[in-house]
């Protein structure tokens, strides 16, 4: 094992700077002459995506086969941190087998709005639940000697303009909603690394945000690992290094090294800043490489497939079961309808896409079951094209069956990295099919596949609804077993399903192309809004049915937590997820009506009862006091609410809590809309009162951070032409129903990323020349680009020669 302190004394400043950026898309720099190995990083929130051939960061090129587990959005419905730890351990095993040192996951973004195209990669709208699950994944991954890298830190809630948007959020909301999940993950999971997000937070890029990285992450939480940029996410590398960012990825080449050298020479940063970052990076490199050298180069694919199936079983959510239609008895004549039954959708699109070791198919699993499958019909075109013939054939089959199993859902491109959803609806051809089938056979079980929320105005057309989410490569077997009663669905929703998208508090301006993203709703995301505003929803947070029933009784409560008895009052074994919420009545602060502060799973046989204890931690009663700039507790009476969902509260006890707050955070601000939870249309004036300062107005500037999608603002025909070509290509891909992820990435990419993602082929000086061209200085800009290109080639060659010791 290398001694980092001694090694730093041997390295030249140039060598040190070179180590703080990647060498290839998913590899760090190695320096064999100093005993520093090169290590692999790989995407892997729900399955490893190591690309042995040509690498890319969007999941476009094939990767090495790996187990595709249910997505985070699915596993969150299990409310099972221990299951997350098992999945994490399997991910760690596969990473070690493929010589990957860092797994880029889990994803911890808060689900502010269900239209976020990447919601399937994230756990929940609740930071406590998300943090607990993420900590489990992290512990599991790192138990195999591999480093976990939770992402994206922080306040990154949309794909639109994700590389250049500025999240404007008040400090209390930042702390209580968007950072608490990361805090739990860091303190309880102890990750070796963390990935910064692309966006700015209150005017400063997350990757160079001193408040986030140095004051909170490293200072308050004690994180001592490596902060890794998202791919192409570095804006000012030197400022990032100074303020706590460790490794710039993927491969910016020699220009990045020269940037740091110049910053040291100018006094912008010091060599001690460089050393501090290397003291975070090098132990990770040495430790993971040593663990990988001792790890087996194979894993038990069958065992991991079985784990993926069990994870899918625990993640299924039964949303409707009218007349106890489910489970289906052996011998039931069933018609299987829907393209998803034969061509499964089990994961999302983008950088998390896994090349699965195998994929189970629901139709095959149903045929192998004790049901009498009388036939299958596709029923609809999965990409939304109307097809009367498909619908007619499906209806004809439905008339011959006792029960119809209809598989519906979102197609592959509806949920993807780089692209936010345009609505929460299922394709109309699927809804039309459901209505047509219901007219000839009302006994319909809908199996729904999606990575996030969908509107369900069609719910009355089916008798049962089983939410399969994106269940991974073994999800089909789990669904078949749930339909036939071999498995009792026990999952509960980790996010609220509204009646309509318009009810979501951030609906009015989510994913606009403005430079600023204003978090006007404050604390009120998800159930925190719906319960406070007393707004009806389709399915509340924490909701999920079972084939059995449970009774809660004999609750005892104090400041430490609660204990209660749970009894299975039904006729079959089942698992109940008991949820503990905290409510403060007559609060002097504005706050959500109730907040999740604990949960527990219990599996019981029919008639069995068990005593449960749910402990409260140091986050149970705290709030961020924006005036005192610290965590405090408001004293007084609290209600501890125990229930089967946020709306289905079974037991309640009141306790008295000693307070610490001495200064009222909002005594001089009129924030009536926040006290009422009336945040659907927050005015500029009210939001500025919450922020404590004027709302920043993002203006389009022709500089390094101009995105390619904004080149129509350029003063150059070349810029207009590039913008026009990209726009046309994007429109064509949309019309084909298959948006091009590569074009989408480029469209939202700032010019500076050209210098961060081309392995040194383009320097920042060349980007500055392009900016001059776009500003209208056509000839000077062209000359600058040519000059900087020649200079870049020469300097890169000289630097590589020095680093090789030639």
Annotate the PLM regions:
Residues 1-619, 623, 637-641, 646, ...:
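Glycoside hydrolase catalytic-domain context in secreted enzymes
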Residues 646, 653-723:
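Charged, amphipathic alpha-helical linkers/stalks
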Residues 47, 368, 507, 572, ...:
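A generic signature of intrinsically disordered, low-complexity regions enriched in glycine/proline
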């Amino acid at each position: 094992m290398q001694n980092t302190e001694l090694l730093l004394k041997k390295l030249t400043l140039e060598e040190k700077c070179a180590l703080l950026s990647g060498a290839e898309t998913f590899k760090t720099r190695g320096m064999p002459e100093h005993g520093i190995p090169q290590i692999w990083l790989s995407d892997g929130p729900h399955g490893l995506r190591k690309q042995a051939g040509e690498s890319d960061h969007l999941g476009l090129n094939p990767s090495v086969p790996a187990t595709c587990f249910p997505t985070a959005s699915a596993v969150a419905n299990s409310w099972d941190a221990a299951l997350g730890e098992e999945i994490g351990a399997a991910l760690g095993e596969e990473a070690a087998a493929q010589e990957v040192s860092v797994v880029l996951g889990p994803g911890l973004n808060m689900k502010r709005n269900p239209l976020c195209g990447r919601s399937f990669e994230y756990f929940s709208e609740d930071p406590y639940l998300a943090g607990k699950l993420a900590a489990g994944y992290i512990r599991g991954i790192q138990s195999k000697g591999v480093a976990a890298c939770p992402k994206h830190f922080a306040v990154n809630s949309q794909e639109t303009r994700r590389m250049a948007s500025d999240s404007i959020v008040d400090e209390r909301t930042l702390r209580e909603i968007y950072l608490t999940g990361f805090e739990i993950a860091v303190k309880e999971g102890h990750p070796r690394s963390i990935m910064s997000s692309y966006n700015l937070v209150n005017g400063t890029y997350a990757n160079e945000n001193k408040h986030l990285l140095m004051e909170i992450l490293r200072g308050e939480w004690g994180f001592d690992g490596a902060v890794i940029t998202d791919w192409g996410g570095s804006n000012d590398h030197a400022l990032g290094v100074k303020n706590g960012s460790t490794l710039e990825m993927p491969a910016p080449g020699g220009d990045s090294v020269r940037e740091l050298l110049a910053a040291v020479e100018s006094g912008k940063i010091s060599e001690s800043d460089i050393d501090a970052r290397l003291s975070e990076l090098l132990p990770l490199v040495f430790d993971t490489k040593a663990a990988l050298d001792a790890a087996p180069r194979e894993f038990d694919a069958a065992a991991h497939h079985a784990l993926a199936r069990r994870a899918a079983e625990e993640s299924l959510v039964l949303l409707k079961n009218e007349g106890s239609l489910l489970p289906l008895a052996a011998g039931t004549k069933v018609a299987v309808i829907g393209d998803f039954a034969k061509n499964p959708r089990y994961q999302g699109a983008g950088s998390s896409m896994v090349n699965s070791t195998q994929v189970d198919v629901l139709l095959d699993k149903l045929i192998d079951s004790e049901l009498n499958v009388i036939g299958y019909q596709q029923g609809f075109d999965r990409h939304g094209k109307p097809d009367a013939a498909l619908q007619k054939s499906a209806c004809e089959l439905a008339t011959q069956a006792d029960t119809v199993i209809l598989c519906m859902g979102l197609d592959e491109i509806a949920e993807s990295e780089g692209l936010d959803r345009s609505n929460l609806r299922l394709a109309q051809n699927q809804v039309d099919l459901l209505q047509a089938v219901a007219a000839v056979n009302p006994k319909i079980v809908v199996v729904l596949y999606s990575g996030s929320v969908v509107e369900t105005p069609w719910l009355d057309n089916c008798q049962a609804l089983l939410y399969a989410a994106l269940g991974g490569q073994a999800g089909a077997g789990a669904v078949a077993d749930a339909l036939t009663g071999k498995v009792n669905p026990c999952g509960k929703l980790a996010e609220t399903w509204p009646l309509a998208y318009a009810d979501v508090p951030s609906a009015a301006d989510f994913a606009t192309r403005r430079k600023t993203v204003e978090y006007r709703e404050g604390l009120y995301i998800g159930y925190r809004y719906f319960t406070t505003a007393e707004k009806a929803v389709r399915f509340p947070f924490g909701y999920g049915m079972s084939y059995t029933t449970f009774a809660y009784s004999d609750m005892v409560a104090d400041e430490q937590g609660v204990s209660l008895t749970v009894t299975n009052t039904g006729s079959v074994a089942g698992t109940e997820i008991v949820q503990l919420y905290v409510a403060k009545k007559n609060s002097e602060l504005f706050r959500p009506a109730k907040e999740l502060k604990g949960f527990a799973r219990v599996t019981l046989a029919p008639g069995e009862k068990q005593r449960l204890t749910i402990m409260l931690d140091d986050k149970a009663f705290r709030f961020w006091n924006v005036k005192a700039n610290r965590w405090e507790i408001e004293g007084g009476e609290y209600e501890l609410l125990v229930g089967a969902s946020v709306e289905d509260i079974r037991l309640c006890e009141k306790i008295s809590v000693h307070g610490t707050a001495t200064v009222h955070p909002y005594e001089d601000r009129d924030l009536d809309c926040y006290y009422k939870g009336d945040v659907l249309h927050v005015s500029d004036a009210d939001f500025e009162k919450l922020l404590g300062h004027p709302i920043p107005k993002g203006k389009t500037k022709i500089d390094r951070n101009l995105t390619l999608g904004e080149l129509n603002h350029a003063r150059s025909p070349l810029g207009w032409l590039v913008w026009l070509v990209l726009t046309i290509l994007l429109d064509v891909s949309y019309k084909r129903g298959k948006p091009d992820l590569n074009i989408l990435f480029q469209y939202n990419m700032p010019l500076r990323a050209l210098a961060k993602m081309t392995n040194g082929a383009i320097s920042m000086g060349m980007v500055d020349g392009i900016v001059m061209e776009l500003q209208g200085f056509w000839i000077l800009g062209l000359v600058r680009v040519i000059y900087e290109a020649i200079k870049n080639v020469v300097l890169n060659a000289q630097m590589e020669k020095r680093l090789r010791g030639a």
